[in-house]
Amino acid sequence: MPELPEVQLAADSLGVQIVGARIVRVERLDWTRMVETPSPDEFITLLAGRQVHGWGRRAKWILLFLDGGWTLALHLRMSGSLTVQPADAPPDKHTHLVLRLDDGRQVFFRDPRKFGRARLLDADGRAALDAAHGDEPLSNAFTVERLAELLRGRKRAIKPLLLDQAVIAGIGNIYADEALWRARIHPLRPASDLSADEVAALHDGIRAALRQALTNGGSTLRDYRNSYGTRGTNQDHFNAYDREGQPCPRCGATIIKTVVAQRGTHYCPECQR
């Protein structure tokens, strides 16, 4: 599933292409379960004629800011992608949402596995989306002190805590493994047991792993592309994730894969304590 870097890059590459454009109509919606709120009929009606004024990201949601105070929130889930296509481009069978713009271009939401989701939110809906998610790890407010506060008193293992979107928003399996490797912390360590130095190292590890991925265009393991259709290259720079049986780049020990909170988890048994 695309995580914070991939979602940010998808949002940026989509937003810069369509900001200022007006959505004339929803031209295709053949998988109505994609729309979580409002009803599919209301979604189609309310989107028509809305102009795109800006874009953003919250957690793993792509946000398009529309006139009238509405926000179109799109979640790529496992296999979703958003691209801008010429006026005459035909959607394939996996393109379940098509938005026609006033200059004739089309926005395709393609999702072979049909896990992607769309929400059209008013101000209250947007506030609820914000409230459901925790701190943004690349924000100025996410300091070492703030991370220490979030971990204090929590006896859960550190990796599932990092994956909890209500605590820290946007981190998934890839960047949890990469951040913990950078911080030299075992994924099963209780969060409340981390020392002040380890919390600081984890804070640095989280931000460094995410920033590296942004620099490298995100991680493409199978489906991810940005809205220009470009693959990321960050998968070529993993230190722990998806490197089972390979040597640790830091100490040479063999990277192990185990299961933590029902998620495949990669770590170095020597470096990470």
From Swiss-Prot:
InterPro entries: DNA_glyclase/AP_lyase_DNA-bd (IPR015886), DNA_glyclase_Znf_dom_DNA_BS (IPR015887), Formamido-pyr_DNA_Glyclase (IPR020629), FPG_cat (IPR012319), MutM-like_N-ter (IPR035937), Ribosomal_uS13-like_H2TH (IPR010979), Znf_DNA_glyclase/AP_lyase (IPR000214), Znf_FPG/IleRS (IPR010663). Its EC number is 3.2.2.23, 4.2.99.18. It comes from the Bacteria. SUPFAM superfamilies: Glucocorticoid receptor-like (DNA-binding domain), N-terminal domain of MutM-like DNA repair proteins, S13-like H2TH domain. Its cofactor is Zn(2+). Binds 1 zinc ion per subunit. It catalyses: Hydrolysis of DNA containing ring-opened 7-methylguanine residues, releasing 2,6-diamino-4-hydroxy-5-(N-methyl)formamidopyrimidine; 2'-deoxyribonucleotide-(2'-deoxyribose 5'-phosphate)-2'-deoxyribonucleotide-DNA = a 3'-end 2'-deoxyribonucleotide-(2,3-dehydro-2,3-deoxyribose 5'-phosphate)-DNA + a 5'-end 5'-phospho-2'-deoxyribonucleoside-DNA + H(+). One of its GO terms (molecular function) is class I DNA-(apurinic or apyrimidinic site) endonuclease activity. DNA binds at residues 94, 113, 154. Pfam families: Fapy_DNA_glyco, H2TH, zf-FPG_IleRS. The active site is at 2 (schiff-base intermediate with dna), 3 (proton donor), 60 (proton donor), 263 (proton donor). A zinc finger (FPG-type) spans 239-273. One of its GO terms (biological process) is base-excision repair. Keywords: DNA damage, DNA repair, DNA-binding, Glycosidase, Hydrolase, Lyase, Metal-binding, Multifunctional enzyme, Zinc, Zinc-finger. Involved in base excision repair of DNA damaged by oxidation or by mutagenic agents. Acts as a DNA glycosylase that recognizes and removes damaged bases. Has a preference for oxidized purines, such as 7,8-dihydro-8-oxoguanine (8-oxoG). Has AP (apurinic/apyrimidinic) lyase activity and introduces nicks in the DNA strand. Cleaves the DNA backbone by beta-delta elimination to generate a single-strand break at the site of the removed base with both 3'- and 5'-phosphates. Monomer. Belongs to the FPG family. This is Formamidopyrimidine-DNA glycosylase. It comes from Roseiflexus sp. (strain RS-1). The lineage of its organism: Bacteria, Bacillati, Chloroflexota, Chloroflexia, Chloroflexales.
